[in-house]
Amino acid sequence: MFTPMPRSSSRPSTAHSWAPFRADERPVESTSPHGRFALALAYANSYHVGMSSLGFQRVYELVHATPEWSCERFFLDGDGPPRSVETDTPLDAFGAVAFSISFEEDYVHCLEMLARAGIPLRRRERGPDDPLVLVGGSCASINPLTLSEFVDAFPLGAAENLLPTLLPALAQEGDREAVLDRLAAAPGFFVPSRHRHGEEPDLAKLVKLELTEEQMRAPGALPTTAIVTPRTEFSAKYLIEMSRGCPEKCRYCWATFGMGRFRWHPTDAILEAIERARPVTDQLGFVATAVGDHPEIERILLEANRMGFRTSVSSVRIPAVTEAVLAALHASGDRSITLAPETGSDALRVKLNKPIPNSLLFEKVRLIFRQGFTQLKLYFLIGLPEESDADVEAILEVAARCRELMLEELAPTGVIGQIHLGVNILIPKPYTGWQRETVEDPKVLERRIAILRKGVARLPNVSLGSMSIRQAIWQAYITKAGADAADALEDAARGMPLSALLRRHAAAIETEVFQRAEGRLRWQFLRTA
């Protein structure tokens, strides 16, 4: 009989100790450490990255809020069999392991964790005593086929809509096959062993269950940090989700296509959440694809300041940068702002479906430095369709002008700020306007990155971070590939260097990455309910 409760395991203990991590954790609300049923909740990366994920923390909170249920967290840290943060229980002792994966590069980490736990990688090789392996998160909703040889079931969409089906299915009588039958019959779950018939899944049943605007306005619907810890990217910040979706429809961005139309959480719910954070921290982080577009962002920031919090935002759309928002953020102690112009060319930005002229960007950058901010991060993409070397040179022109504005506005303060350019390579994502496009020729990318490096070297107080071309090729492959990527993923999980990996699987990578996709796309069996 399948049981979701932890059982004894013969796996040896790992040298990695979670005791210092537990000591630093401050739960916002108390939770029961034990329930009749327990779920292994795994993040396929380090504790630092995983506990920075609001989605991961939201699932943890929701499971613990379910009567008779608890969950224990697992991360990539250490090199022995993974053990839980809460009780040091080994991963293979649980009846079900639910991974949250937001980045394609973590597919390999997921397999590494399974291998270290002694859990068979391929789903067909698992027996009745092996845990069920589930994968949720944004990657599952983009293209679950890549991992379909390894994963027993994919919950598709928002955890709030999926856990009420998943947890009872795990708790009912029956073996693992009975659980998979129950999930396959429910909306919002892709079960490869049940839905795969030859090359095509059963299209009629596969829907992605996202949160509706009405659900987001219901009591308890606001995702917030469940456990505050200094051991994250946000260092003891209490994170609050402001909205979902995005008012823009940029052709390269999955979030604008895959998360539904822009909708925001009620202001009263956000202010109540801020109040709950008081006992555990004085730092807040507001996160969303479009934080500044919440209709009451100014009121929220001012109220947070009044309560004595230091606040920051994940990023702000260029049109949403206002003097009032900047003043509130600066007053709370924030000195860094992130914008995403994506390209230096007005014309190319229009083709991105992001018609924001450089004149508006410069106006907002002047406001930012005039308000006293000293750190500006600008994100750009290269390898875009119809991009030229001149468009890449335009990125340098934008950086130079932003630097001039920084020096002009900060001169009276005697402070010299910093500008960082983060440059990524276009990875054509499923469900975006450019899902059929290819990755740019590596030689062209090398030349354009060299142009940027040479240009930035001439700009004091401007730094550059660029994506690895090899990593971009690998990410593009596993983003768009089907089940035939299993051998490559297994090679990567066993430690094959990236250069050797790209050589060994060159033919498949050439097809997926450098040839334009035609006809029906393999991932187009998912639809949003």
Predicted regions and their residues:
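Glycine-rich beta-alpha loop elements in corrinoid/cobalamin-binding modules
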Residues: 76-201, 430-482, 489-500
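Short secondary-structure boundary/capping segments
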Residues: 56-58, 114, 149-151, 170-171, ...
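Short helix-loop-beta junction
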Residues: 58-70, 305-308
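Radical SAM enzyme core and accessory elements
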Residues: 1-28, 35, 39-41, 449, ...
